Regions:
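Active-site rim helix/loop that mediates acceptor-substrate recognition in acyltransferases
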Residues: 47-80
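Conserved N-terminal entry element of GNAT/NAT acetyltransferase domains
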Residues: 2-52
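Conserved acyl-donor/pantetheine-binding loop and adjacent beta-alpha core of acyl/acetyltransferases
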Residues: 72, 76, 85, 89-129, ...
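C-terminal "cap" of GNAT-fold acetyltransferases
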Residues: 174-206
Length: 206
């Protein structure tokens, strides 16, 4: 019998995003959060994800000052932040909170123009560690934050992402509030423009 031709190669299964675990930032996970920040140069030069909080960054901002302020918020329970884990390693986060908890958004003057209703919740800073980008970390964080908001009673949620279509690719620091298309995946809609490339996007969660 003549040799049969070998069967065609089986196509490789499509790549899927890793299965992440999410946990809230609190006293029990502070060291995991701090390790991620330290591994990424304090995050954008030492922000420590304090920029949206009432204290903000300011002229006297330093990594030491910002770390201390963030730790105080964690101890006092005045922070809402989802940490994303790959195994036992914290690889990113998604910050959220009320306008009172996160009052310092970007472009505040433009934001107040045409404001008709304050949101119940804001999504602030989104961060992914440098070795884990483009693997769905931000998506997992936003999903977990929205689940937490739903569990807390829902309401009107705002995000302040950057438009990515129609412009040159941007480095991560410019996308610290997330890209617009990420929030479109979760049903957010444009409300109004507050900067050349930044939009207020909204979604109501029942």
């Amino acid at each position: 019998m003549a040799d049969q031709p070998p069967p065609p190669p089986t196509a490789a299964p499509p790549e899927t995003e890793p299965a992440y675990v999410t946990r809230p930032l609190d006293a029990s996970t502070w060291e995991d959060f701090a390790a991620l920040v330290d591994a990424n140069n304090g995050v954008w030069g030492g922000c420590w994800c304090i920029g949206f909080h009432p204290e903000g960054l300011g002229d006297r901002s330093s990594a030491t000052r910002n770390r201390s302020l963030k730790h105080a918020h964690v101890r006092h329970g005045t922070v809402h932040q989802v940490l994303i884990y790959d195994g036992e390693t914290c690889v990113g986060w998604c910050q959220y909170g009320s306008p009172a908890e996160l009052p310092r958004i970007n472009n505040p003057k433009a934001y107040l123009n045409d404001l008709t209703e304050l949101p119940d919740w804001r999504i602030g800073c989104i961060f992914t560690g440098k070795d884990h980008r483009r693997n769905g970390v931000a998506r997992a964080g936003v999903a977990a934050a929205l689940d937490a908001i739903k569990d807390a009673g829902g309401g009107l949620v705002e995000a302040y992402p950057e438009q990515v279509e129609g412009r040159e690719p941007q480095r991560g620091a410019y996308l610290h509030t997330g890209p617009e298309n990420l929030f479109e995946e979760f049903g957010f809609k444009r409300d109004r423009r507050i900067a050349k490339w930044r939009w207020v996007m909204r979604r109501r969660i029942p």
